[in-house]
């Protein structure tokens, strides 16, 4: 039998029907639903007189539009409130396996909520009307974002039409150095292969450094796969995966658990499996990363300097650097560790889990917010993450440092709620995108790890965390 990649196994086990042009009908196991991309889909079902094909495939929460402060005042923005209220009504009418509404204890960012509830399991196909659905591939699942029309198709038929991507292996061999996190690995890889490097591919991450990551680290890595242009990112199942899933609310139990684990252990690429493309990196080459421009590929080690466009021979790239420097208000040759910040945001579906908050708290403990830093927002990814952080006293560490301890939600990752940057404000952010205006009109975003963000908060500028006691 031909050796198969993990992607081959996941894809082949979900093909319902093949068309002659390479298009297939692909079965979907889990559909994650939030308030932004679902209203039109639910309306389409109503107009056609349809119901959900499988109510027990749907897990839903409100996240993009929900405020992270002053919950006693409710949702002030009328459009945001309408979207959240509409989700409430649609779930009440159509049903779901689980729904975590605004202010519910389990509410949170959909890509944090799903895994912590055990709604994401190895071997599943997972879709959501959100580009960072690739996060769930960390479980040995095939996960990717879909558009609103596909959201409706999934609701009505439990299938989508798709063409198989090419396969790519990205391996990080060796051990990561102290102070280097999954976020740094992700940014480093994007810096090496570019934001189009994974276009047309489903990426499997492997190698010793990847296997050493926790599930939360793997989720960070797979979350960023889309920023390298990939359709999806995934990590093979191992004991780390199984241990994380065990005991989660929607995980199998008893005999069903034993059977599931037996199957899950097969969700690895076979020995001798051939990938369409491979990249291999030495983990020891990876340092703490900071983006300097308006694309995740515009990234350097913390010890680097803002590049000089005059040194770029490619006219298209040179023009891109010039535009980025103008927007970001930076001068060529400026050391990254001398760039001051105005705002710090620690949160998003990339870095708002309990381990991320622990990393940030370890840096913040015993320090105070720097005088030039206007605000530091700490936004847990879910109500359960917030509860755990408070049990550990992390909230007290942040508050004593002068940081804001917020309620769960997408927050400042994107300018779709009350948390946003003002023009020209410079932000050290643990989110996943640094495009122009992503965090607010004219806002300047630098992507970093939670520890690096916390270091910037207390020093007032980007700082190599390895130099801090």
Curated annotation (Swiss-Prot):
One of its GO terms (molecular function) is 3-isopropylmalate dehydratase activity. Its cofactor is [4Fe-4S] cluster. Gene3D superfamilies: Aconitase, domain 3 (3.30.499.10). It is an enzyme of class 4 (lyase). GO terms for biological process: L-leucine biosynthetic process. The keyword 4Fe-4S applies. Its EC number is 4.2.1.33. The keyword Nucleotide-binding does not apply. [4Fe-4S] cluster binds at residues 349, 410, 413. Pathway: Amino-acid biosynthesis; L-leucine biosynthesis; L-leucine from 3-methyl-2-oxobutanoate: step 2/4. Pfam families: Aconitase. Signal peptide: none annotated. Binds 1 [4Fe-4S] cluster per subunit. It catalyses: (2R,3S)-3-isopropylmalate = (2S)-2-isopropylmalate. NCBIfam families: leuC, PRK05478.1, PRK12466.1. PANTHER family: 3-ISOPROPYLMALATE DEHYDRATASE, HOMOACONITASE, MITOCHONDRIAL-RELATED. Catalyzes the isomerization between 2-isopropylmalate and 3-isopropylmalate, via the formation of 2-isopropylmaleate. Belongs to the aconitase/IPM isomerase family. LeuC type 1 subfamily. Heterodimer of LeuC and LeuD. This is 3-isopropylmalate dehydratase large subunit. It comes from Neisseria gonorrhoeae (strain ATCC 700825 / FA 1090).
């Amino acid at each position: 039998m031909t050796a198969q990649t993990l992607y081959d196994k996941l894809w082949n086990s979900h093909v319902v029907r093949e068309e002659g042009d390479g298009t297939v009908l692909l079965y979907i196991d889990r559909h994650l639903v939030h308030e932004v991309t679902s209203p039109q889909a639910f309306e389409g079902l109503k107009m056609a007189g349809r119901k959900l094909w499988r109510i027990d495939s749907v897990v839903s929460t409100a996240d993009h539009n929900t405020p992270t402060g002053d919950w006693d005042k409710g949702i002030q923005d009328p459009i945001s409130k309408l979207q959240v209220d509409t989700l409430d009504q649609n779930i009440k009418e159509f049903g779901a396996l689980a729904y975590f509404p605004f202010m519910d204890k389990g509410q949170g960012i959909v890509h944090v909520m799903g895994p912590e509830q055990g709604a994401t399991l190895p071997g599943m196909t997972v879709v959501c009307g959100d580009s960072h659905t690739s996060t769930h591939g960390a479980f040995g699942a095939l996960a990717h974002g879909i558009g609103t029309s596909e959201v409706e198709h999934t609701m009505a038929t439990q299938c989508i039409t798709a063409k198989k991507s090419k396969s790519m292996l990205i391996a990080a061999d060796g051990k990561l150095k102290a102070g280097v996190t999954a976020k740094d690995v992700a940014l480093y890889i994007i810096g090496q292969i570019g934001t189009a490097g994974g276009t047309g591919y489903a990426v499997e991450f492997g190698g010793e450094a990847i296997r050493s990551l926790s599930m939360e680290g793997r989720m960070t890595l797979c979350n960023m796969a889309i920023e390298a242009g990939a359709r999806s990112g995934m990590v093979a199942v191992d004991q780390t995966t199984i241990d994380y899933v065990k005991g989660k609310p929607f995980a199998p139990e008893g005999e069903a658990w034993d059977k599931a684990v037996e199957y899950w252990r097969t969700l690895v690429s076979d020995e001798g499996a051939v990938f369409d493309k491979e990249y291999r990196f030495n983990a020891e080459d990876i340092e703490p990363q900071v983006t300097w421009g308006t694309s995740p590929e515009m990234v350097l080690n913390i010890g680097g300097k803002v590049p000089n466009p005059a040194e770029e021979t490619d006219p298209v790239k040179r023009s891109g650097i010039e535009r980025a420097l103008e927007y970001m208000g930076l001068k060529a040759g400026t050391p990254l560790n001398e760039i001051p910040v105005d705002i710090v945001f620690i949160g998003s579906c990339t870095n708002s889990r309990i381990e991320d908050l622990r990393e940030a708290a370890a840096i913040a403990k015993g320090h105070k917010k720097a005088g030039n830093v206007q605000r530091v927002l700490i936004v847990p990814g879910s109500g359960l993450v917030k509860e755990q952080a408070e049990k550990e006293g992390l909230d007290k560490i942040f508050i004593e440092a002068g940081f804001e301890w917020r309620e769960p939600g997408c927050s400042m990752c994107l300018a779709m709620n009350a948390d946003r940057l003002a023009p020209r404000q410079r932000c050290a952010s643990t989110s996943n995108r640094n495009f122009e205006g992503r965090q607010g009109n004219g806002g300047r975003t630098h992507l970093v790890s939670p520890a690096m963000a916390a270091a910037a908060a207390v020093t007032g500028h980007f700082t190599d965390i390895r130099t801090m006691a």
